[in-house]
Amino acid sequence: MKILYPGTFDPLTNGHLDLIERAEKIFGKLVVAVLENTSKTPTFNLERRIIQIKNSLSHLPNIEVISYSGLTVDCANDLKANLILRGLRAMSDFEYELQIAHTNKSLNNDIETIFLSTNTNYSFLSSSLVKEVAKFGGEINHMVPPSVEKDLKDYFK
């Protein structure tokens, strides 16, 4: 069984990190797949996001970090992953993620999506929110790992 946790991670938040750590305890191994989304202009380029994630996950030896573009289901197929992990912060996330899960299932019937609820300490977090707070000089050390905090502060100087 191979588990795929996809996302843009622009940037990685403590919510993402918590989900990865919890999934690693449950499943043992996990592939974090960083999307190069050509329809968005990211704050950090793909290479920088991968470095941020690897730095933040160095204490977890069973986590592999890769990049991909295109459909998540195609990435899962290429890796022979049969489970896609998604985090849920609120009911609105569930509605969106369920639609994506059904789409992925329609493209590959062997792919299942597993949902983990977000730790309540991080249920308010989103990458967009973190960037907004950082942009206006707010404190983000409780929202993101240290290397991401430094990168965001440098970016918004």
UniProtKB/Swiss-Prot annotation:
Site entry: Transition state stabilizer: H16
Enzyme class: transferase
Pathways per UniProt: Cofactor biosynthesis; coenzyme A biosynthesis; CoA from (R)-pantothenate: step 4/5
Reaction(s) the record says it catalyses: (R)-4'-phosphopantetheine + ATP + H(+) = 3'-dephospho-CoA + diphosphate
Disulfide bonds: none
Cofactor(s) required, per the database record: Mg(2+)
This protein's GO CC annotations: cytoplasm
Keywords associated with the record: ATP-binding, Coenzyme A biosynthesis, Cytoplasm, Magnesium, Nucleotide-binding, Nucleotidyltransferase, Transferase
A GO term for molecular function: pantetheine-phosphate adenylyltransferase activity
CDD domains with a match to the protein in the record: PPAT
Enzyme Commission number(s) of this protein: 2.7.7.3
Family: Belongs to the bacterial CoaD family.
SUBUNIT field: Homohexamer.
The name this protein goes by in its record: Phosphopantetheine adenylyltransferase
Species for this entry: Prochlorococcus marinus (strain MIT 9301)
